[in-house]
Amino acid sequence: KGVFELNPGECAMYRHSKLRRKKYYTVEAKEHTDNEVTTIEKTRYLLTDAIQRQLVSDVPLCFFLSGGLDSSIIVKTASMYNKEHKLGKINTYSVEYRDNKKYFQKSNFQPTPDYEFISMMSKNADTKHREIVLDNTLVCDALYESVQARDLPGYVDVDSSLLLFCKEI
């Protein structure tokens, strides 16, 4: 009772025994007027800038590589940055489930296994890659701990897999 989650773009201040919620940001939909070339240039600039700003670190960084579009763009951009600044290869990690390669069945949602794209991207970005293999029983056993770690309902096996994956790294 009395516990809530803030909405996106909202902050809260507790002062003088009162809680005040305030909206500080709202996304506005606007008409897109740029042509294809300009759109590509702006998108590339914004993505590269956002990723490179996160690469400044006193310790070596590592990256989750799922083989999907998001992680692949991040890994390739980070790899190019490290190469340009002579910082060496980046470390990438992926998660796999024991016997998934053996029992994989394609679907409309997932027509091919992730490991094919992970391997392709790791080679393309020239990373030091490590695959973490999780046992399905351990993923199930970690469900309760993952709910506690998130402190709110989440994505069931995805959360427990992520918890075990991070522990392994």
Feature-to-residue mapping (PLM):
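N-terminal segments that mediate ammonia production and transfer
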Residues: 1-34
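ATP-dependent adenylate-handling active sites, centered on carboxylate activation for C-N bond formation
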Residues: 28-169
